[in-house]
């Protein structure tokens, strides 16, 4: 049913692969067991599943998940998601992907193609629409940054990587201790930096 094809990337809590699942192209995230912080690894895996039943054009969809893994693998579980490509907003902004390398409209010869006003507005609207939907479902991302916004071949932005997300009850986090597994310090909301509770 599941056949891994090629690695797409890796991060603090796992690796992502391009794969096929029942004949469809998907992305597979294998969440690794952390010898240093098992609780954080477990929290990251379950946080990814906060969006498991949600479907929205601007959110990467979870197709399936499993906690079954061969003993030989150092894995807590596997999450199968829709494949949206390997281009992120980070690649587009900083020109770090071959698909977005210098073009004829390279302004200033800095080695990257500048975003047009139309692209900027489109991407911003996609991200805000995705965030508004997540917040309406009581989910806060807590690690929203350009590297976690994927851009499809059709130019649609999809929010992904929910390893730090929280499901809020009545619009408030249950604990002031948020995102135990990290998140990206330089992209945190001011209320998180102040140690306040998360709200949507």
UniProtKB/Swiss-Prot annotation:
Keywords: ATP-binding, Kinase, Nucleotide-binding, Serine/threonine-protein kinase, Transferase. ATP binds at residues 8-16, 29. One of its GO terms (molecular function) is protein serine/threonine kinase activity. It catalyses: L-seryl-[protein] + ATP = O-phospho-L-seryl-[protein] + ADP + H(+); L-threonyl-[protein] + ATP = O-phospho-L-threonyl-[protein] + ADP + H(+). Pfam families: Pkinase. The keyword ATP-binding applies. It comes from the Eukaryota. InterPro entries: Kinase-like_dom_sf, Prot_kinase_dom, Protein_kinase_ATP_BS, Ser/Thr_kinase_AS, Ser/Thr_Kinases-Pseudokinases. Residues 2-200 form the Protein kinase domain. Gene3D superfamilies: Phosphorylase Kinase, domain 1 (3.30.200.20), Transferase(Phosphotransferase) domain 1 (1.10.510.10). The active site is at 143 (proton acceptor). Its EC number is 2.7.11.1. Belongs to the protein kinase superfamily. Ser/Thr protein kinase family. This is Serine/threonine-protein kinase mos. It comes from Apteryx australis. The lineage of its organism: Eukaryota, Metazoa, Chordata, Craniata, Vertebrata.
């Amino acid at each position: 049913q599941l056949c891994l094809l090629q690695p797409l990337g890796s991060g603090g809590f796992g690796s992502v692969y391009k794969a096929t699942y029942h004949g469809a192209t998907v992305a597979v995230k294998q969440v690794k067991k952390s010898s240093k912080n098992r609780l954080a690894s477990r929290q990251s895996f379950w946080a990814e599943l906060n969006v498991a039943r949600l479907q929205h054009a601007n959110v990467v969809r979870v197709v399936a998940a499993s906690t079954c893994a061969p003993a030989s693998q150092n894995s807590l579980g596997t999450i199968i998601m829709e494949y949206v490509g390997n281009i992120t907003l980070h690649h587009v902004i900083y020109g770090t992907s071959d698909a977005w390398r210098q073009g004829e409209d390279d302004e200033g010869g800095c080695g990257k193609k500048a975003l047009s006003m139309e692209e900027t507005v489109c991407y911003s609207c996609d991200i805000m629409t995705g965030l508004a939907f997540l917040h309406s479902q009581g989910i806060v991302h807590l690690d929203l940054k350009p590297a976690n916004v994927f851009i499809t071949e059709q130019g649609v932005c999809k929010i992904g990587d929910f390893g730090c997300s929280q499901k809020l009850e009545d619009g408030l986090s249950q604990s002031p201790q948020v995102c135990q597994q990290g998140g990206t310090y330089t992209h945190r909301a001011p209320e998180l930096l102040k140690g306040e509770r998360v709200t949507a």
